Amino acid sequence: MSVTLHTDVGDIKIEVFCERTPKTCENFLALCASNYYNGCVFHRNIKGFMVQTGDPTGTGRGGSSIWGKKFEDEYSEYLKHNVRGVVSMANNGPNTNGSQFFITYGKQPHLDMKYTVFGKVIDGLETLDELEKLPVNEKTYRPLNDVHIKDITIHANPFAQ
């Protein structure tokens, strides 16, 4: 199961881990299928750490799950922030997942068991390279020029009715 994020700087194909994180994947895939992420900016970009998106307000403070409320974390000892390209839910503490997610630029073991890992980049690491190179505001880490998710292609959605 995978999706492709079509961004202003290229495509990123992500394998999603539906068996290990079913609720997170149901939320993510439903948001993808409803075009929720279309137009979202990458609002936080920290070189060597991660890039974050998934807030339709573009502020980094918005976004909602498909259930209209925060939902619980799904941790697995098998899913770690151990390579470049790990995809995880952003949160504000335990069990506060909504719509925002991030992609790591490298190993981030301090994030393990704090953020739900639900996917990994399987194609488009060169696009991740382009995102990481973007100049940012040194205080907010917001890219100086907005880069958007234009749209998303879902490849074989197991939750589709």
Swiss-Prot record:
Modified residue annotations for N-acetylserine: 2
Q: Which InterPro entries match?
A: Cyclophilin-like_dom_sf, Cyclophilin-type_PPIase, Cyclophilin-type_PPIase_CS, Cyclophilin-type_PPIase_dom, Cyclophilin_A-like
For this protein, the record's PROSITE patterns field holds: CSA_PPIASE_1 (PS00170), CSA_PPIASE_2 (PS50072)
Q: Which GO terms describe its cellular component?
A: catalytic step 2 spliceosome
Question: Which sequence positions carry the modification called Omega-N-methylarginine?
Answer: 61
Query: Where does the PPIase cyclophilin-type domain lie?
Result: 2-154
Q: Name one Pfam family in it.
A: Pro_isomerase
Describe, as the record does, how this protein assembles with itself and its partners: Identified in the spliceosome C complex.
Any one GO molecular function term: peptidyl-prolyl cis-trans isomerase activity
Which controlled-vocabulary keywords does the entry list? Acetylation, Isomerase, Methylation, mRNA processing, mRNA splicing, Rotamase, Spliceosome
Q: What is its EC number?
A: 5.2.1.8
| Reaction catalyzed | [protein]-peptidylproline (omega=180) = [protein]-peptidylproline (omega=0)
The entry's protein name is Peptidyl-prolyl cis-trans isomerase-like 3
Gene3D superfamilies listed in its UniProt record: Cyclophilin-like (2.40.100.10)
Which family is this sequence assigned to? Belongs to the cyclophilin-type PPIase family. PPIL3 subfamily.
Entry superkingdom: Eukaryota
GO BP terms = mRNA processing; protein folding; RNA splicing
Task: Please describe what this protein does.
Answer: PPIases accelerate the folding of proteins. It catalyzes the cis-trans isomerization of proline imidic peptide bonds in oligopeptides. May be involved in pre-mRNA splicing.
Which parts of the chain are coiled coil? none
Q: Which organism is it from?
A: Rattus norvegicus
